[in-house]
Amino acid sequence: MSDSKVNMVSPPEGLTGEGFFATKLNDVVGLARANSLWPLPFATSCCGIEFMATMAAHYDLARFGSERVSFSPRQADMLLVMGTISKKMAPILRQVYEQMSEPRWVIAVGACASSGGVFDTYSVLQGIDKVIPVDVYVPGCPPRPEQIVDGVMRLQELVKSESVRRRSSPEYQELLASYNIS
Amino acid sequence: MSELLLPPEHRYAKIIKERHNEDGSELSVLNLGPTHPATHGIFQNILLMDGERILEAEPTIGYIHRAFEKIAENRPFYQITPLTDRMNYCSSPINNMGWWMTLEKLLGIEVPKRAQYLRVIVMELARITDHIICNSILGVDTGAYTGFLYVFQFREKIYEIYEEICGARLTTNMGRIGGFERDWSPEAFRKLDKFLEEFPPAWKEFENLFERNRIFLDRTVNVGGITAEKAMAYGFTGPNLRAAGVDYDVRVAHPYSSYEDFDFIVPVGKSGDTYDRFCVRNAEVWESLSIIRQALEKMPEGNEYHAEVPDYYLPPKEDVYNSMESLIYHFKIVMGEVPVPVSEIYHAVEGGNGELGFYLSTDGSRTPYRLHFRRPCFIYYQAFPEMIKGALLSDAIIILSSLNVIAGELDA
Amino acid sequence: MALENTQIQNKLTETFNNDVFNFHEERDIFTLEASADKITALILFLKNDSELQFHFLTDLCGIHYPDNESERQFAVVYHLHNWFENKRIRIKVYLNGEKPEIKTISNIFLSSNWMERETYDFYGIDFIGHPQLKRILNMDEMVSFPMRKEFPMEDSGRTDKDDRFFGRTVSNC
């Protein structure tokens, strides 16, 4: 039992005593948020099928806290953009991102969402970071479900270490202003 | 209320202003928008509704237009296969094989029997994956999530077989001009045998969950029906047309890749409603399994997997490093300087959704002059506004799922 | 009894005389050219005739030939199919380069509605009498017709492509 390869999650740093555990608010909030990220699957093309495979029984994404996929932007934490976004679709993506409530994160899954992919044409948006800020990029065409899960895990690291005050900080407001998002 | 959603000169705004119901209620407009949990892919429908009933629909597509036909005019023939993958991405080997067969028709190449049988096996596996997705997602839309989880496991098994053959799971880019890029390993055949053993009981279980299920029958029988004449006028092909009663199948009408050697029936429905489409797809999965078994039994001896066309097929690497002719062929093929006749070809294969056609017009250079894809989804989606007239909103969702509209094929 | 090419050719020439020409078997599909003003009559004849029975429209697309003479710059290609005899036929109609227009066949074949819109969207060919001729795949605000040969494939607004890495110099692009 003691030499098993299972990685036990350790609690954040803090003071333990009889009946209490004191730690920083950032750590607790980060831990809670990271392990319950509800995705909004914005699946447009082939990467969407690999997402379906990720949510299915074999590569279950629900283990990581994404049990409930939310199609309503107000109730979702992370926006998974999977597939090619064309210029016709970009305003709609923008609207969905603006409707999401803070804190919100974006993962660009696949080559098309990250940078336009193989479609260097007049009608395809060359990367969704032209319209919304992106946190994690997952390359691949399409990425294997293990890669998508890896992307979600990297996002979890980001979320754990994020400060509670980040969303009202001037740097974040500047980032949003650079995308013209009020 | 309608001023917020629609510009006042829109047709629906005028209809709403003029029409008054007896009980004082007004008509309303609903935007079944591009991002919707139940529409598989992004297309928009603006619906004019009377309460819960749909009176009219106005579809908008093109939200994932990636200009395949424009890209194809700038790419040599080998580099167009990844584009064909991404059209109907649920069954990409069929698209690939269709493209290779178009090129073989253009160049006049005869593919050996064994390679043709292997192609048949891969295409039927792809058809099974397409129907798995369509039927299980139809189940999810009616509320039955379990069927989807059960049969998706078998999609993983088929992905493993694809990986043995070509290395990729979903967008396979499989095959070459004249056959395959490498022979199938014994592991691929072993996995195929295991799949043929394990899948039929699972598919039987899936069918039993739905075919006599009271709730499913209530939701799908007499919903979204279409007559055979209307279907032919709207250009329907594939399972949607066969559910309406017309037994047109490209594999039977213009057999390609040795389909005439196999014995299979073409399942046909009666009324073209959602239940018939579901049952036709179920029956086609059984037929595909039977075709795969026949192909495995009748597979010719030997291990040739490609035609002897050094002009178009890359020679093995050992020969490239040791022999002058192979080096020259390799160079010419990679640079795209292969002899291409000036001609026009139309070739069609039976895709998961119907007749997938490739219209290729060449002018002798290394890229096509014009390549047009005859995409079945694009053509039969035109009938959708008519099919949902008078239906309830949730029926419209079920009808859309059962039509199996794949956005990549719709917009290309 | 199978439908022979000579049979089709004879029937069409005796009904349409000089408006159908250039009959040949291109690989495995019988191809012919027709003049633009007779196209609706031709397609209706092919659909309704009891011997020919080409009752299914498989495909409709356009092609741009900028190197041809100005009367033959655009082409509209129709593929029809007869399921009873398993026979396909292809009809090509060449149009003027300045003002490409042709009558719609959407009242004969309902499936040609969106196919003609797509051809308009890509090439700017005007289909006279079409119920709703507007763009279908591209954005509505687009003014140019992207599949024409002079239109570039790549997104011209890109700023992040370094020309050095693509071999593009002032002299070759």
UniProtKB/Swiss-Prot annotation, chain A:
Cited PROSITE patterns: COMPLEX1_20K
Compartments (UniProt record): Cell inner membrane
Top enzyme category: translocase
Binding positions for [4Fe-4S] cluster per the UniProt entry: 46-47, 112, 141
Cofactor: binding comment: Binds 1 [4Fe-4S] cluster.
Entry similarity comment: Belongs to the complex I 20 kDa subunit family.
NCBIfam families per the UniProt record, alphabetical: nuoB_fam, PRK06411.1, PRK14820.1
Record-given protein name: NADH-quinone oxidoreductase subunit B
Protein's organism: Flavobacterium johnsoniae (strain ATCC 17061 / DSM 2064 / JCM 8514 / BCRC 14874 / CCUG 350202 / NBRC 14942 / NCIMB 11054 / UW101)
Higher taxonomy: Bacteria, Pseudomonadati, Bacteroidota, Flavobacteriia, Flavobacteriales
Gene this chain is encoded by: nuoB
